């Protein structure tokens, strides 16, 4: 396979594209992260999500420390070619570094952000570094 498919993507000025990870079984949005060309290429090659960490300025294989990897089921590109949707099988049921299933665990209710999702596992038990 050539890399021509990567040229279709409308990358941002800094060479990134947002990637939404969605649970393939129940459709729940798990997280949003960023990918550059190399991250997306490695994701396709490995079959597991690899993102670009904007804060650390390096590739990040999701679950490399926690074991909570994301097995890719499908990758979709939106109509404007500037957002990816990853259909994933979330290993361990935890996508968020807070120990929750989803990074979207707060909901706006009556002008307040309310936590609506429990911690599945304490992050101190997940991340030992």
Curated annotation (Swiss-Prot):
Cysteines engaged in disulfide bonds, as pairs: none
Primary localization: cytoplasm
UniProt remark on cofactor binding: Binds 1 Mg(2+) ion per subunit.
Cofactor or coenzyme needed: Mg(2+); Zn(2+)
Residues annotated for Zn(2+) binding in this entry: 79, 96, 103
Enzyme Commission code: 3.5.4.19
Pathway: Amino-acid biosynthesis; L-histidine biosynthesis; L-histidine from 5-phospho-alpha-D-ribose 1-diphosphate: step 3/9
Homology family: Belongs to the PRA-CH family.
Protein name: Phosphoribosyl-AMP cyclohydrolase
Origin species: Nitrosomonas europaea (strain ATCC 19718 / CIP 103999 / KCTC 2705 / NBRC 14298)
